[in-house]
Design a protein with these regions (language model features):
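Flexible "cap/lid" loop of the alpha/beta hydrolase fold
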Residues: 273-314
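Acidic catalytic loop of the alpha/beta-hydrolase fold
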Residues: 380-385
């Protein structure tokens, strides 16, 4: 299609106004985001960079009205190049065009994408404009064909609490869950920043994993169902490599796990690399880092800690667009839910490790894969830690393996457990065979 058609979004999307308005009126999620006591109407818009003809949306308490027109008077405008909007408005969007957040960027910064106007309103209304853009795409090109969710009817996990003395944080009442065949190789799963172990229920109930491994997950201190440490001050959480690696080592020891495989995504993928570096200290047998790299080199914002932003709304919105648009909606909703339900400061404090607290540059090259095999996995829809970053890290580790996961994003274990297990099972089989060769 001629890109000139996307310079004027008023003309390109204007014919969908009636259809879009109908979807906005009927959408339960949007209603939940807008029936929140909004006192003053906010007008926002989206348009092609350098052009004022676009789409406008007036947001009030329980009411959203859409129209096409000049975006000059909008409080804020979501702007992108014509070719970027063209890719966004696709029934099969390529990464990172599944989300305006992906276009806005971190490690994939899209030149030409910017938010014009009042940034505070852009952040405050993040769940509203995100949902409206999703529905606008649906009105233009139809719904994205997502994969079906898993239909498990039996749960195999057993959960308990254990007191563990942790370096840095001290004595903590931690929650953990286990499933699988105790006679099979042990694997311990680590959740992402600002979330909890519920992320792995789909994986830990999957038949291919139940027959393959003895699986353990635990919630980090103050996350999910784990209690804060006895010294934790509300809002003061901060994570670093020594605290994180020390916690993993302490849990492995407390639960009597024998040379487990350590697997996690995002910050947990980063720490899996740290575990490989310090494998003897931790007692780990192998690692499967997901969505991981030797260093996260990007500018950090502090939106996740601002007292002017509703963290239970903003944090899940910020990470929502990191997932594949083809992942089952029910599973993506679970990711949103777990990120909405954590205590203030936990996500921000975990990012202290993700942003600069982890630095494997000049260190990952020294990982001895004959003693701790490494198999890295990264989903192609992740715009935070991209497959290219993970692959570059894997190439620096002698003997490491890397696989790009098609149709998965930043939260592979949660957003689409069945698809993820196809890759995870291969990784487990590989590292288990390599562990048999370890001295």
């Amino acid at each position: 299609m001629d890109l000139r058609a996307w310079t004027n979004l008023e003309e390109r999307l204007g014919p969908t106004v009636e259809k879009l308005q109908g979807r906005l009126n009927e959408d339960q999620q949007l209603r939940a985001f807008t029936e929140t006591g909004i006192k003053e109407h906010v007008l926002f818009g989206w348009a092609a960079a350098g052009h004022e003809a676009g789409m406008l949306c007036s947001v009030g308490n329980g009411r959203v009205n859409i129209r096409s027109g000049q975006v000059t008077d909008a409080a804020f405008v979501l702007s992108a190049l014509p070719e970027q909007w063209q890719q966004f408005y696709s029934s099969s969007p390529e990464p990172p065009f599944q989300s305006y957040w992906g276009m806005f960027g971190q490690n994939i910064h899209q030149e030409g994408v910017e938010v014009r106007g009042k940034m505070d309103l852009f952040l405050a209304l993040a769940p509203i404009w995100r949902r409206i853009l999703d529905l606008s795409r649906e009105a233009f090109c139809g719904p994205i064909e997502e994969e079906g969710p898993s239909n498990l009817t039996t749960d195999n996990l057993v959960g308990r609490y254990v007191y563990v003395d942790l370096p840095h944080w001290g004595r903590t009442k931690l929650f953990y869950e286990q499933s699988g065949d105790i006679s099979k190789p042990a694997i311990i799963f680590l959740h992402t920043a600002g979330s909890d172990g519920r992320q792995y229920h789909g994986v830990m109930n999957h038949p291919d994993m139940l027959s393959r491994c003895h699986m353990t997950l635990f919630d980090m201190p103050g996350h999910g169902r784990s209690f804060p440490s006895e010294t934790q001050i509300p809002g003061c959480h901060s994570n670093n490599e020594d605290a994180y690696v020390g916690t993993i080592a302490a849990v492995i020891k407390a639960l009597g796990l024998k040379k487990p495989i350590v697997c996690g995504a995002s910050m947990a993928g980063h720490v899996s690399l740290a575990v490989a570096i310090r494998a003897e200290e931790v007692g780990a047998g192998a690692v499967i880092p997901c969505q991981a790299a030797e260093f996260t080199d990007m500018e950090r914002n502090h939106w996740s800690r601002s007292p002017f932003i509703n963290q239970s709304l903003f944090t899940p919105e910020y990470i929502y667009g990191m997932m594949s648009p083809f992942s089952p909606q029910r599973e993506r909703n679970l990711v949103w839910h777990t990120y909405s339900g954590q205590a203030f400061g936990m996500y921000h404090g975990d990012l202290d490790f993700y942003f600069g607290g982890w630095d494997g540059r000049g260190r990952v090259e020294k990982i001895d894969t004959s003693r701790c095999p490494v198999y890295m996995l990264t989903g192609d829809y992740d715009w935070s830690t991209t497959p290219e970053l993970s692959a570059a890290t894997a190439r620096k580790i002698p003997g490491a393996k890397f696989k790009k996961m098609e149709g998965l994003g930043h939260f592979p274990a949660t957003e689409n457990p069945s698809r993820f297990v196809r890759y995870l099972a291969q990784a487990v089989d590989y590292v288990v065979e390599e562990m048999k060769k370890s001295p």
